[in-house]
A protein has these predicted regions:
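Class II aminoacyl-tRNA synthetase-like tRNA-binding/catalytic domains
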Residues: 1-30, 40, 118
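Metal-assisted phosphate- and nucleotidyl-transfer catalytic regions
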Residues: 41-162, 179-211
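Active-site pocket scaffolds in enzymes
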Residues: 172-245
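Short, cationic-aromatic polyanion-contact patches
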Residues: 247-254, 268, 298-310
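Hydrophobic residues on short alpha-helical segments
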Residues: 254-261
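Short acidic, hydrophobic short linear motifs in intrinsically disordered regions
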Residues: 266-276
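Short amphipathic alpha-helical interaction segments
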Residues: 278-292
Length: 310
């Protein structure tokens, strides 16, 4: 189980289920092969076929899946090539695309905003987005062919990410430098940047970590797509529910006042009091009880105090 103190919508829940897998002496290429085979197997087990209907889409989980780099995806949908661009150039491009960005965002966050706004929703069939810029992936190993990139992929289905994987960064010196870069972003006001250095993690890497690939799959979203459920609340054991309205218990005096109010709402406070025939003490107690129980409210107008039913 995972928890993130973030918002809720049809595909997000603060508490969610994830499957994580780590395999020594493998890389993200191996993990992509494993991921697509796993999801094809899951689709067949659930539906008897690799195809699953989700809303108006028919999703085919049969392997292999297309593999598109982050730079290729952005260039395809926006015409802008992020390769070799500076932070200022990317920020200007984002603003030209009418994407709301600000000066607190570093290069990685800017690229993430462009991809999220212009590209992500277009990938309906399972597609691996690969080779993320280093600034977007502080825990991911540097790409073997391009030091500006990392060996990372995310699997997109129906315009949503359902898997995220790396060739894990196991170099403690490189990892420390990434943490320090995150601190600088946090100082600029980036609320998603890591605001501390995890010295315990660095010490563990110094003792030695073999080449490793790791992946996390959002199981709730995967179940949504395999079972044609449009809301994540439909696939959770304990979904978020509206609080049940408690039945209001009224005294006999409150019932008498409420009966008059319900038939005449809104009504002047003095008129309601007169019709109730209650003594001052009983009247005060009854009207206070009704307003405290949120079944009635008193509002001041230019002419008098008015009472109405809620």
């Amino acid at each position: 189980k995972n928890f993130r103190n973030e918002g809720m919508d049809r595909t997000h829940n603060p508490e969610f289920t994830a499957m994580e897998i780590y395999v020594s002496y493998k890389d993200y290429n191996w993990m992509m092969d494993f991921c697509e085979q796993l999801l094809e197997f899951c689709a067949i087990e659930v539906n008897g076929t690799s195809k699953a209907t989700f809303g108006q889409h028919q999703i085919d989980f049969k392997a292999p899946y297309p593999r598109v780099t982050m730079a290729e995806a952005i260039q395809h949908f926006t015409g802008f090539d992020i390769t070799g661009k500076t932070e200022d150039e990317i920020r200007k491009a984002a603003l030209d695309m009418k994407i709301p960005v600000d000066d607190t965002m570093g290069k990685g966050k800017l690229i993430d905003e462009i991809f999220g706004e212009k590209c992500e929703g277009n990938y309906i069939q399972p597609t691996f987005i690969t080779d993320y810029p280093k600034e977007m992936s502080p825990l991911c190993k540097e790409h073997r062919e391009n030091p500006e990139l990392t060996e990372r992929f995310e699997l997109m289905v129906c315009g949503k990410e359902i898997a995220n994987a790396y060739s894990e960064l196991n170099d403690p010196i490189d990892q420390r430098e990434r943490f320090e870069a995150q601190l600088k972003l946090a100082d600029r006001g980036d609320d998603e940047a890591t605001a501390f250095i995890d010295y315990d993690f660095l010490r563990a890497l110094e003792y030695g970590m073999p080449p490793t690939s790791g992946m996390g799959i959002g199981m709730d979203r995967l179940v949504m797509f395999l079972t044609n459920n449009p809301s994540i609340q439909e696939v959770l054991f304990f979904p978020q529910m509206r609080p049940e309205k408690k039945k209001v218990e009224m005294t006999e005096d409150e019932k008498a006042v409420y009966t008059i109010l319900k038939a005449n709402s809104p009504i002047a406070l003095e008129e309601l009091k007169a019709q109730s025939g209650l003594s001052n003490k009983k009247w005060d107690k009854a009207i206070k009880g009704l307003t405290a129980s949120k079944v009635a409210k008193v509002e001041k107008t230019d002419e008098s105090l008015m009472v109405s039913v809620l």
